[in-house]
C-alpha cells in the first residue's frame, strides 16, 4: 500500500538495511495529492532504495511468494499489509442506525437515533469543499469530534464544521502536505476550478540552506480556495497549515495575498510563498495572465524565454529560444495566429514576458505554470520504477 502507513513503514525498513518493495494498485502513491506532487515523492523513495511497483496489486499469497495481478511473482520474508481502513459499522447496523459506507451523522454528530452519537473514522463527515459525505480517517478530526460529542452530551450544542483532510507525511528527506480537494476529486465532483503552480523557497534564497518547494493551488472563479498541495524538504507544512486556516475561515486567494506572516531571512522571504501563491492565482482571475499546463504543450508553439546558455542546458521538447531580454526586438518571430506558450525555469520570467507581449497586442500568449522545473518532473522516467 502506498498510503501514509505503507510509506512510513517502507522508510523504516530501508533505515534498518532491509531490501524493501512497496506495491501500490494505483498509478501513484499518496492518493490525497495529484500525480505531479506524488511523482517527486516517488523519485525520493526510489533514490533511497525502495523498489516501487505501481499499477499492480496482490492476487494471492503462497508460503514465501506473492503473486501480483500482472502474474509476476515476488519472493518475500516479511509482508506487511498497509492497504487502508474500512469503517466497522456492524454494531451500528445491529442497533438500527442509518449507515452508508460509514455511520450517518448530523452536524452535532448525532446518529439517526437521537440518543446515540458517533465520532471518528467510522462516520461519514461532510467534505469541507464539496459538502458531500466522505470518509477521511485522520486523527485530528477524530479528536475534535470526540470533544464535540462530549460537549453535546453536556448540553453545549457544538457542531462539527466538516473535514478539510489536512494531512502531512515525511518521506525520507521530503515532506508532502495537503488540504482540501485535489484536482482528481474536483473533476470527479464536476467542480469548476483554476490551478497554479509556484516554486517557493523554504526561506530567503540568499540565506544558506534554502530549499525549493513545489506548491499546487486549486481555486474557484470567485477566488475560493479549493485545495493546496506542497512537496519539499522543509517549510512545506507551515505554508499548508496557513492556507488550510484561511480555507477554514472561508477566505480567498486575496486573503493569501494579505496574510502577514513571520519574516526574517532564516525563516521566510519578504513575500512568503503563501503570498506568492495568492498573487499568482489573483493574476489569473484578473486576466493578467493566461495559464498553460503540461497537457496544453502538444498543440502550441513553445518559446523558452530564458537566456540561451540556460536554454541549451535543457528545455521543453520542441521549444524555440527567444530570451526575454530580446523579446521586444524579435516580435516578428512570434506568430499571432497560433497558441503560443512561454516557458522559463519556474514560471516567473514567462509571466513577465507574457505581460510584455500582451502590451504589444498579442492575445494568443500563455505562460507555462511551473516552468521547466515542473516539466522535468512530469517527463522524467523514474529509474527502477516497475509497472504492471
Predicted regions and their residues:
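Mid-to-C-terminal Rossmann-like scaffold of FAD/NAD(P)H-dependent oxidoreductases
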Residues: 122-234, 265, 269, 273-300
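A short, polar/charged loop-to-alpha-helix boundary motif
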Residues: 234-253
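Glycine-rich Rossmann-fold phosphate-binding loop(s) that bind the pyrophosphate
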Residues: 1-3, 346
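Conserved SAM/SAH-binding loop
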Residues: 55-59, 63, 70, 324-326
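FAD-site-proximal beta/loop scaffold in flavoenzymes
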Residues: 67, 73-148, 242-246
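Residues at the starts of beta-strands that form the adenosine-phosphate
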Residues: 18-21, 51, 115, 339, ...
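Rhodanese-like catalytic fold shared by cysteine-dependent sulfurtransferases
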Residues: 254-301, 307-341, 345-388
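Rossmann-like dinucleotide-binding cores of NAD(P)H-dependent redox enzymes
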Residues: 4-60, 138-141, 159-184, 383-385
